[in-house]
């Protein structure tokens, strides 16, 4: 196999697991109202149920690094997608049966392996990006957006066909399991022997040390800012639009446009990175996202919500993926640093919704959007830390 063909296959396999991970997540979110009705949950209880997915992810991330180091990405990918697929099938049956306890357990068991797969995908994505002459990482993340869009539209069609949650989740689970496990066979089967006490202590020290590195902390702040912008949009943009007169359908359509812009930005973002470099691209993304949020915040007065959403989505599209590549510059520390930033992502997924909700309750949701806007302006000022490291 030629090197060019090898990189192409590697890129396709890594992109595939981003797509399937998004497909599962989107399939669950898109049928949220039916899940809520089947389990007889009020809004607060549904919010708690939804938090179990990222909560399971945080648990999974605590041992994702050692798992990959010991067994390699290929075997870990196979095991985690098998668990996630089986749990997703069980989740559908539990929801239709109205069994809240089982639904909670299965949702936790979906979130846990999905976070490990998130780690695997970013490790492989960073590696294939470094092996290529062109910047590929934003395009790999773009397949996550494609998965979100496919999942949402597929769910809409299946609902119109009166497909039960059990049947839908079973079909999605089987498809995701087969495609993802097959894709993982393109990954290198690299494993390390059982660690000695000395090497285990050294690995723990390395993992802990990245949380005290100035560069890693600053990049994590930038990554957190972009994820806060994404999470706050997913949770609050449709609600904010309905507050200013949009129908639920119109708000959903606007949010769909937002995700289309993000996906296109990620698929094409590599060309921008190749032209301007990582640091300038992150600087531009931070400023563009902040300007989009500010335009959206002014929406009730200037009536340009779509302009705000397009700028918001376009700027946000490449920002977070590039912070991961910045964490992966040094192969020796890539695993620990990428684990760090993904942990920040899952922590933000749990905290951002309630935090902005509290501010929104007190001051209005449009005012609350000022928090991610301010953080993105700070991120623009910090963007210099994302310059490529010179590895000695």
Summary of predicted features, one role per range:
Residues 115-130, 317-331:
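Intracellular juxtamembrane helix-capping segments at the cytosolic ends
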Residues 35-36, 67-68, 157-162, 241-242, ...:
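Interfacial helix-cap and linker-helix signal at transmembrane-aqueous boundaries
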Residues 276-323:
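C-terminal transmembrane helical hairpin of 12-TM major facilitator-type secondary transporters
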Residues 82-97, 288-300:
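C-terminal ends and interior cores of transmembrane alpha-helices
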Residues 19, 99-117, 304-317:
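Hydrophobic core of transmembrane alpha-helices in multi-pass small-molecule transporters
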Residues 167-185, 369-384:
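Symmetry-related core transmembrane helices of the 12-TM Major Facilitator Superfamily/SLC fold
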Residues 4-31, 108, 213-229, 310:
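Pair of pore-lining "gating" transmembrane helices in MFS-fold secondary transporters
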Residues 28-29, 214-256, 260, 264:
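Extracytoplasmic gate region of multi-pass secondary transporters
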């Amino acid at each position: 196999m030629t090197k060019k063909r090898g990189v192409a296959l590697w890129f396709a396999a890594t992109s595939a697991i981003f797509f399937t991970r998004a497909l599962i997540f989107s399939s669950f979110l898109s049928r949220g109202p039916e899940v809520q009705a089947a389990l007889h949950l009020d809004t607060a209880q549904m919010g708690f149920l939804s938090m179990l997915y990222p909560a399971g992810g945080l648990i999974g991330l605590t041992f994702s690094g050692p798992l990959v180091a010991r067994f390699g990405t290929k075997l870990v990918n196979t095991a985690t997608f098998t668990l996630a697929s089986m749990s997703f099938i069980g989740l559908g049956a539990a929801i239709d049966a109205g069994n809240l306890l089982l639904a909670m357990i299965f949702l936790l068991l979906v979130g846990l392996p999905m976070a490990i797969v998130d780690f695997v995908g970013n490790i492989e994505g960073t590696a294939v990006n470094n092996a290529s002459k062109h910047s590929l990482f934003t395009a790999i993340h773009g397949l996550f957006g494609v998965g979100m869009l496919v999942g949402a539209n597929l769910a809409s069609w299946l609902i119109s066909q009166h497909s039960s949650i059990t049947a839908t989740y079973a079909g999605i689970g089987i498809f995701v399991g087969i495609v993802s496990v097959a894709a993982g066979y393109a990954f290198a089967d690299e494993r390390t022997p059982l660690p000695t006490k000395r090497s285990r202590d050294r690995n723990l020290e390395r993992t802990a040390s990245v949380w005290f590195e100035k560069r890693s902390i600053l990049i994590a702040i930038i990554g957190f800012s972009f994820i806060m912008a994404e999470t706050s949009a997913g949770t609050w943009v449709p609600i904010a639009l309905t507050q200013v007169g949009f129908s639920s359908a119109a708000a959903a359509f606007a949010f769909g446009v937002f995700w289309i812009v993000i996906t296109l930005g990620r698929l094409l973002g590599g060309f921008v990175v190749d032209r301007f470099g990582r640091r300038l691209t992150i600087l531009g993304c931070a400023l563009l996202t902040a300007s989009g949020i500010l335009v959206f915040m002014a929406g009730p007065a200037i009536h340009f919500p779509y302009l705000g959403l397009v700028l918001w989505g376009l700027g946000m599209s490449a920002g977070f993926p590039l912070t991961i590549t910045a964490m992966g510059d040094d192969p020796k520390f890539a695993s620990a640093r990428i684990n760090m930033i993904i942990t920040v992502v899952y922590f933000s997924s749990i905290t951002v919704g309630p935090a902005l909700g509290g501010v929104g309750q007190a001051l209005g949701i449009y005012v609350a959007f000022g928090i991610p806007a301010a953080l993105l302006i700070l991120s623009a000022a910090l963007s210099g830390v994302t310059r490529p490291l010179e590895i000695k």
